[in-house]
C-alpha cells in the first residue's frame, strides 16, 4: 500500500535529522494518512478513501465531498478517486436530463 493521499497526491518526503552538532542523517517525512468514509450526496453512496488529515478539512471547506472531487484536478487524484469522480459526473448529468 502506497503512503499517498487519494485526493491530494501528497506522499512521502525525504529530508535530514540535524543534531545540535549539525550531523545530518536521512529520514522520511510520512503524511498523516487516515482511512475516511465520505458520503456522496449525488450518488447516494459512501466511499472509503485514504486521505491525509489536512485534506479532511479541505473537503469540508469546499462544501462537501462532491464539490471537492468535482473541482479537483484529475492529475492528482488516484485511480480510485478518478473512478468515483467519473461516477459522480455521470449521475449528475443523468439527473439533469
From Swiss-Prot:
Gene3D superfamilies with a match to the protein in the record:
Ribosomal protein L28/L24
User: What keyword terms does UniProt attach to this protein?
Assistant: Ribonucleoprotein, Ribosomal protein
Query: InterPro entries under this entry?
Result: Ribosomal_bL28, Ribosomal_bL28/bL31-like_sf, Ribosomal_bL28_bact-type, Ribosomal_bL28_sf
- A Pfam family cross-referenced in the UniProt record is Ribosomal_L28
Q: Name one GO cellular component term.
A: ribosome
- Superkingdom of the source species: Bacteria
TM region(s), chain numbering: none
Q: Does the keyword Lipoprotein apply?
A: no
One example of a Gene Ontology biological process annotation: translation
Gene Ontology molecular function, alphabetical: structural constituent of ribosome
Matching entries from HAMAP family are given as: Ribosomal_bL28
Protein family membership = Belongs to the bacterial ribosomal protein bL28 family.
- The protein's name: Large ribosomal subunit protein bL28
Q: Which organism is it from?
A: Rickettsia canadensis (strain McKiel)
Gene of this entry: rpmB
